[in-house]
């Protein structure tokens, strides 16, 4: 892409030399050619930025539509994992309770018999 030659201040401050019949036609033409190039560059840049802006808006819209679906499936999957973990933990606690009753229950019964 072509680079921008003039700033607005450059255009404002441009002075043309006067010739016999006014300004030098060649100098004015060269300056205006450069101004036209700048405007074409600005126009192309604006067009490119508008296209990029439009593309990014579409991408954002698409992601916003996909986000609730993916979030819901992640929550459901996470809930399923949590439920499975809870069931596993509960099963372990039941087994531990039975084991404690078996081990400590005999000790409690033995101590009760000793007290009698």
UniProtKB/Swiss-Prot annotation:
**Biased composition range(s): Polar residues:** 67-78
Coiled coil region boundaries = 32-69
* Locations listed in the record: Cytoplasm
| GO BP term, example | regulation of cell shape
Q: Which domain of life is it from?
A: Bacteria
InterPro entries named in the record = Cell_cycle_GpsB, DivIVA_domain, DivIVA_fam
- Spans annotated as Disordered: 57-78
GO CC terms, sorted: cytoplasm
Entry's transmembrane regions: none
Is Cytoplasm a UniProt keyword of this protein? yes
| Keywords annotated in UniProt | Cell cycle, Cell division, Cell shape, Coiled coil, Cytoplasm
**What Gene3D superfamilies does the entry give?**
6.10.250.660
Is Cell cycle there in the keyword field?
Answer: yes
Name the major location.
Answer: cytoplasm
Q: Which Pfam families match?
A: DivIVA (PF05103)
Q: How does it assemble?
A: Forms polymers through the coiled coil domains. Interacts with PBP1, MreC and EzrA.
Q: Sorted alphabetically, which HAMAP family does this protein's record hold? A: GpsB (MF_02011)
Its family remark reads: Belongs to the GpsB family.
Q: Which NCBIfam families match?
A: DivI1A_domain (TIGR03544), PRK14127.1 (NF010725)
Q: What does this protein do?
A: Divisome component that associates with the complex late in its assembly, after the Z-ring is formed, and is dependent on DivIC and PBP2B for its recruitment to the divisome. Together with EzrA, is a key component of the system that regulates PBP1 localization during cell cycle progression. Its main role could be the removal of PBP1 from the cell pole after pole maturation is completed. Also contributes to the recruitment of PBP1 to the division complex. Not essential for septum formation.
Name assigned to this protein = Cell cycle protein GpsB
- Could you read off the lineage of the organism from its UniProt record? Bacteria, Bacillati, Bacillota, Bacilli, Lactobacillales
């Amino acid at each position: 892409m072509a680079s921008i030659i003039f700033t607005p201040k450059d255009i404002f401050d441009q002075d043309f030399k006067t010739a016999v019949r006014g300004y030098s036609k060649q100098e004015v033409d060269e300056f205006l050619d450069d101004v036209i190039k700048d405007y074409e560059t600005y126009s192309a840049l604006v067009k490119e930025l508008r296209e990029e802006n439009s593309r990014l808006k579409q991408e954002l819209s698409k992601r916003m539509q996909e986000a609730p679906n993916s979030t819901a499936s992640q929550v459901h999957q996470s809930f399923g994992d949590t439920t499975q973990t809870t069931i596993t933990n509960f099963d372990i606690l039941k087994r531990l309770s039975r084991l404690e009753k078996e081990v400590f229950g005999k000790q409690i019964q033995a101590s009760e018999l000793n007290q009698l």
